[in-house]
């Protein structure tokens, strides 16, 4: 359910604002400044060239004022705290997380389990409006029903005055029951706009670099935001690329695609490869779900990843792969082998991200210190699955399975079957890895928990790399042919 608040910024009551600041513990001096800003404000109405007499304002946060959105968000948070604590409003439960709402400024979306919860939500909003001044505009709000529960009012087309829709637009992206309709709204409807923009500029006598700049700044920007929520259909990408190339070459391409996507030093023009560009942006989402914060929008991806790699939910704490039995293990360190798509029960968006990460993390670390911290679990080279007993005994990283670490000689009371499994894991370590370890004088004690990625023979912390670096790496992997230097006119 997406609720629209009537004249959101203009409705907030001043007294409610002051009490909100006091509730959140702002100091007396700060509260006085806020009162100074809002108290005694006057305004007038411009009508047909004439100004009315000035009158005193008792509510609203001025639009355009830098502090207004922050104050509005604080006022709305009071309502959200009440809704989250209300047991009569039941949200969607994902493992231990119950998600009731998400919000961005005045755009609030609610995820409700049943009809009673929806009724209680609207009732709470009505009560809140008497205090804060924020009223729900039911005619502009929308409701998407995914339940089999009867009597929602589908026949009348409304639920308690809120229109029932088949597709819901949230922050510029459509969600709904029909994937075909959503794909059209999110992607295919943009084709005509792209064609119109390029046809206007086609009349100009532009260079290749100028045309490429227009493609990147004006044409691609129309749909890139949507691709960060779900991957576009493959035929949509083909249609967009056809429009781009028709504009760039005014007909049949004169130079191979792998050449023009290269940088200037390699004879290209930095033409954007859409698939690689989208992958480079989206793979950075892994920086969030494998980080130290646990947000509601990470709940589903974490659940799907556990199911994909058959991780027992009781053993894993959020975020995924973090602090397993007091050992730091991370998905990106494991040189994972991503199972086939048919085993993935979640949204294809996250599976595609994992496949991109698999490509990026193929290359071995350059430094031995980083190499020793690679986990032995879910390792596509060692072909291992997670073993609770062995992990609890302290065997989790490459450094743990070699004689230099006296721990393996003691085996920490492991059963014979587990000892044999541990030795078989050690035997699977490639000779080139073993040589690095034998010839290294590095300490076998220190473990670097950060996710290390090797780009152009240099080790980087994954959380610090940019989309541009990832894009260049993907292009380098894709473009294996030697680029010819072309003369740009």
Show where each model-derived region lies.
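Conserved, non-catalytic sequence blocks in retroelement Pol enzymes and Pol-derived host proteins
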Residues: 5-11, 23, 60-72, 93-95, ...
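Inter-domain linker/hinge segments that demarcate the starts of reverse transcriptase
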Residues: 117-132, 191-196
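Basic, alpha-helical interaction scaffolds
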Residues: 159-232, 252, 283-290
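Short, conserved micro-motifs composed of acidic
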Residues: 49-51, 121, 136-168
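Active-site palm subdomain of RNA-directed nucleic acid polymerases
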Residues: 74-105
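Conserved pre-catalytic core of RNA-dependent polymerases
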Residues: 1-78, 244, 489
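Catalytic palm active-site di-aspartate
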Residues: 1-8, 34, 60-64, 68, ...
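Extended C-terminal regions of large enzymes
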Residues: 240, 253-489
